[in-house]
Amino acid sequence: MRKKLTALVLSALPLAAVADVSLYGEIKAGVEGRNFQLQLTEPPSKSQPQVKVTKAKSRIRTKISDFGSFIGFKGSEDLGEGLKAVWQLEQDVSVAGGGATQWGNRESFVGLAGEFGTLRAGRVANQFDDASQAIDPWDSNNDVASQLGIFKRHDDMPVSVRYDSPDFSGFSGSVQFVPIQNSKSAYTPAHYTRQNNTDVFVPAVVGKPGSDVYYAGLNYKNGGFAGSYAFKYARHANVGRDAFELFLLGSTSDEAKGTDPLKNHQVHRLTGGYEEGGLNLALAAQLDLSENGDKAKTKNSTTEIAATASYRFGNAVPRISYAHGFDLIERGKKGENTSYDQIIAGVDYDFSKRTSAIVSGAWLKRNTGIGNYTQINAASVGLRHKF
């Protein structure tokens, strides 16, 4: 009998050792379709006395896509005297094949937590990413059109150290530091050039890291009301020659990554929200400021707003989002007709607490000058399971 009890205790030890580890994640995928429309207006010239307007559109492209599936592990250990060790490891996965090849490519860290707050090091989400959970709850493989990808281009999970304060009567704050060697490198994208009537391929050239990057945040929550302020500063921005390509095309565009880095890049975002019963409202405003690397230190700026509203009717949650970017200022001059507008509408239907059908449609119009624009129409239907 004693031998059986001993064996039972020994077999339970490994389970006790990992009892504080949680496995979680989301598997979500579906069918997406989208098409592009554009208009180009050419002013009169000697060879062309009339205004020339060219319109074009692509066919509808449909494919099965992963909508951002991931898996995560997290846990903690009591170190005594109110101190805990905390850790987390998250990884992108794809049910449509492909996906990330390195572990910990999502928020992954190790740290300490106690009455003083929480200190973490690793790939840690910044304050902008935290705030976007309320303003952009959409699931899609197309983050530029079917999510508020332009508005939330500063969301990131940089390799950094972050401190979060404890709650003081509803207020809390955070500071975050990204060392220069961990900041994203600017680079010249691969491209073709014409030499002696021959197309010559020029490979991508990776440059030096941009600079140290600093983040700060302030949060407030009282009942159904919540608000946050997010701040970013980089002495040398690493987005490349033209930050406004990020504004227009999104951070993954090669056109956004040239060789003329910006200086004194700072971003400010205010987000407010209200939740009551089945109603959820969120509103955000964002200001992006920078200087050019030229001797004149000319100024750039973009101003944007976004709003999201949803209401639960039984198992269904209809939702709508709107974002607007005002005409930008580049090198001290206002860009005429350089705004953008975006609308996303859809509904989630919960089959259970963990499994939902997700349906959405999106429209994005980017004005790229007087008489010029690019428009993206997108729609998706899929399934999401949380565990």
From Swiss-Prot:
Transport listed as a keyword: yes
Keywords: Cell outer membrane, Ion transport, Membrane, Porin, Signal, Transmembrane, Transmembrane beta strand, Transport
Membrane topology: Multi-pass membrane protein
GO aspect biological process, one term: monoatomic ion transmembrane transport
Signal peptide stretch: 1-19
The organism's place on the tree of life at top rank: Bacteria
GO MF annotation, one: porin activity
Quaternary context: Homotrimer.
Function per UniProt: Serves as a slightly cation selective porin. Major antigen on the gonococcal cell surface and it may have pathogenic properties in addition to its porin activity.
Family: Belongs to the Gram-negative porin family.
PANTHER family: MAJOR OUTER MEMBRANE PROTEIN P.IA (PTHR34501:SF9), PROTEIN YDDL-RELATED (PTHR34501)
Record-given protein name: Major outer membrane protein P.IA
Organism of provenance: Neisseria meningitidis serogroup C
